Each structure stands twice: as structure tokens, then as C-alpha cells.
Amino acid sequence: MTDLLSRAHAVALDAADPLRGLRDAFVFPQHGDDDQTYFVGNSLGLQPRAARAMVDEVLDRWGALAVEGHFTGPTQWLTYHQLVRDGLARVVGAQPGEVVAMNTLSVNLHLMMASFYRPTAERGAILIEAGAFPSDRHAVESQLRLHGLDPATHLIEVDADEPNGTVSMTAIAEAIAQHGPRLALVLWPGIQYRTGQAFDLAEIVRLARAQGAAVGFDLAHAVGNLPLTLHDDGVDFAVWCHYKYLNAGPGAVGGCFVHARHANSDLPRMAGWWGHEQQTRFRMDPQFVPSPGAEGWQLSNPPVLALAPLRASLALFDQAGMAALRAKSEQLTGHLEQLIHARVPQALQIVTPAEPARRGCQLSLRVAGGRARGRALFEHLHAAGVLGDWREPDVIRIAPVPLYNRFSDLHTFVEQVEAWAAA
């Protein structure tokens, strides 16, 4: 009988993987003569090999055409951001007009809050999760202060209520119901960055809208990781980055979703000339006429060099399909979970929920013995060419990415944990 937790079985799974060829589409950092075992796509995705050619194309056109590159050819810069629109829409489950690649995540969050956070005397509170990513919290607190409101009274945090530090849907529902008459906005992550917990977006939308609150999501750790259905879920807005699972490079341009029901609304917004409708933009008229859909929230002309790697990555997502990627992801992360329980249960505690529907590819791990032991294991793994990442105070995050990670990589990780624990 085959040992389903053996390296030999993992190698067989790799050989049978219908997505195995996608690994060759990425550039891997090297450790000695071998590829690094890379589990940090949740922090910075690997470079698609095609990205260099697409960046070079932009540079070549800049050199050959200079300013005329804005208006010449199928990859003209005037509409370059639209080259990623359809692919992004497929990844997040949106209509093409509901998405735009622009700015960065925190900038886009401020722009969305300028439109969707409309406090009144009775309804001015914002609900977030306790332990939110710091940039989100900074943005929320600063928006409250801009409106003359005190975060101490108008920022509501939902505390973790489960043993591993995760948040139940019951706790979220109770908080929304309790504070409903005060809520102007619910802002929630698709996946919590430290614990790896995924949330039911559609249910959060339903709960928030039942109380009359707008609802938005930070999808930094969800986009390209989970299949999303933002349009059908009725999300008001969402923001995300493209440098994690979307592999668009360090500091990559961000992404934004605005539901179609807001496309032609009179929502106030922070306006800029690239948000003006395209046909009359270069008339330089003083009156702002927004482009329909999410593009109407653009401020400045797109960063074409930053968009080029995103084109390369989205082509791979189209080649694979989100359903197939998610199926492999569930297998990879489930296999990693089984290996940890079977071989290093005394060394590692899994923080992330066990139910596949409540997680993406990431497993967040605590090391027995506390922070110092955790750091020691983290440094051991790094020295061995097995790269995860560390999040204070005591979590190692391991994210097997289905585009380029293998089942045998999981064994490399667990073998190194065993070697460290035995030393």
C-alpha cells in the first residue's frame, strides 16, 4: 500500500498535477545549485518569466515613440490599464467595468472611503476586525479624524473569539447587529493576514446591508488566492494589491472594485483628470465628467511600467483558471496540514482554521516554546533555503501557491522542521 504521506507519493502527485507546467513560467531565487523552496507568495509573488519581455516592450516603445506612445498601437499607454481589466474581472468575479488597476491599496482605500464612508450624526461608526492590518487601521482612524470623529468612540473592533485567535461568523453577526444603528461602514478583510482565516464575504455583505451600512473589503490576501464573486455578492467596494498572489512585482499597482450599481451614482469622490471620461479628457474642460464604472475613480495616468508585469501574471491565471488553481490549493494546503499533524505535532500549532472554506493557501504556525523558539526555527528554515515569513509576535506563515509550489516542497519544509527539532 502506498504511504500517502511519503515523499514518493508527493513526487507522484507532482507528476500527475495538470498545472505542473506553470512552475516553469516563474523565476525562482536560488539556494546553492537548486531553486529556493519558496512559500512567500502571500508576501511577494515570484516573477513571471514573461514579465521582462512586457516591461522591455514598454521601454522599447518609449525609446522609439516617446510621447506618441500614448496614442499609437494596440498597447498604447492611453488605454494600457484596460489591457488588464478583463483578466482582473475574471479573477475577482466582477463585470469588466467594475474593476480598475490604479494607485496602491492604501491610496485606493482612502479614495473608496471618501465616497462610501458618509457619516451622519446618528450613523458614523466604522466596524473592523481587532488586529487589522496596520495600514487599514491607520486609514480608518485618519478618516474618522478627518470627519471630526474620535476613534475611541467611533471605531468598533470585533475581537477574536475562537481558541486559535480567529473570529467566528457569530461574533461578526452579533457585532453588526449590536452596533447596526450606528454603523456607516463595515470594512473587513477577505483573509486575515496574520491567522490566514478566510471569511464569507456574501454573508458579511448581507449582515451589513440589513443594518443600512456600506460594506467594503481589503482583499490583499484573497485576490488570486480564493475564487471571488464580488458582483454577485453585492460588495460596495473592494481594494487589493497585486504583488502577492498576482505576481506583479514589488510595489505593484493596486486594484479596486466598485459595484455596478454605483457606476452612475452621484457619490462624492476625490477626482483627478484620468478619471474624466476618455473621449473628452484631452479637451481639458474644467468640469469633471467621470468615466463610467470604477475607472471614474482614477486620478492620474496609469503607471504603464508597473502594469506590464501584471499583464504577464494575468495571462497565467487565464491559462489555469481560478477553479483549477483553487482545487490544487486545497490539496496542497490540506497535504501540508496532514504532514504537520503526522510528523511534527509537538513542534507546530496550526492557527489557521482547518475547514477549507475558512482558509486560503496559507497556514499560520506557532512554534512550541514561544517566540524565541519560533524565531530560531524561522532562521533555520531560511538558512536551509526554505522561505516562509514571520509576523509578530510569534507566527510563521507558510503559503503553498498552486501556480508554482509542488507537493514535494511540503516535504522539504517538514523535513527541515524535523531536523531542527531533533538538533
From Swiss-Prot:
The entry's keywords: Hydrolase, Pyridine nucleotide biosynthesis, Pyridoxal phosphate
Catalytic activity from the UniProt record: L-kynurenine + H2O = anthranilate + L-alanine + H(+); 3-hydroxy-L-kynurenine + H2O = 3-hydroxyanthranilate + L-alanine + H(+)
Modified residues (N6-(pyridoxal phosphate)lysine): 244
Gene Ontology biological-process entries: anthranilate metabolic process; L-kynurenine catabolic process; L-tryptophan catabolic process to kynurenine; NAD biosynthetic process; quinolinate biosynthetic process
EC number: 3.7.1.3
Cofactor: pyridoxal 5'-phosphate
Keyword Hydrolase: yes
Gene Ontology cellular component annotations, sorted alphabetically: cytoplasm
Molecular function per GO: kynureninase activity; pyridoxal phosphate binding
Enzyme class, spelled out: hydrolase
Gene3D superfamilies on file: Aspartate Aminotransferase, domain 1, Type I PLP-dependent aspartate aminotransferase-like (Major domain)
Residues that span the membrane, as ranges: none
Keyword Hydrolase appears in the UniProt entry: yes
Annotated InterPro entries: Kynureninase (IPR010111), PyrdxlP-dep_Trfase (IPR015424), PyrdxlP-dep_Trfase_major (IPR015421), PyrdxlP-dep_Trfase_small (IPR015422)
Protein origin, superkingdom: Bacteria
Pfam families, sorted: KYNU_C
Listed pathway(s): Amino-acid degradation; L-kynurenine degradation; L-alanine and anthranilate from L-kynurenine: step 1/1; Cofactor biosynthesis; NAD(+) biosynthesis; quinolinate from L-kynurenine: step 2/3
Binding site for pyridoxal 5'-phosphate: 105-106, 133-136, 218, 221, 243, 273, 301
Entry's family note: Belongs to the kynureninase family.
Quaternary structure and interacting proteins, as annotated: Homodimer.
Task performed by this protein: Catalyzes the cleavage of L-kynurenine (L-Kyn) and L-3-hydroxykynurenine (L-3OHKyn) into anthranilic acid (AA) and 3-hydroxyanthranilic acid (3-OHAA), respectively.
Family annotation (NCBIfam families): kynureninase
Protein name listed in UniProt: Kynureninase
Organism the protein comes from: Xanthomonas euvesicatoria pv. vesicatoria (strain 85-10) (Xanthomonas campestris pv. vesicatoria)
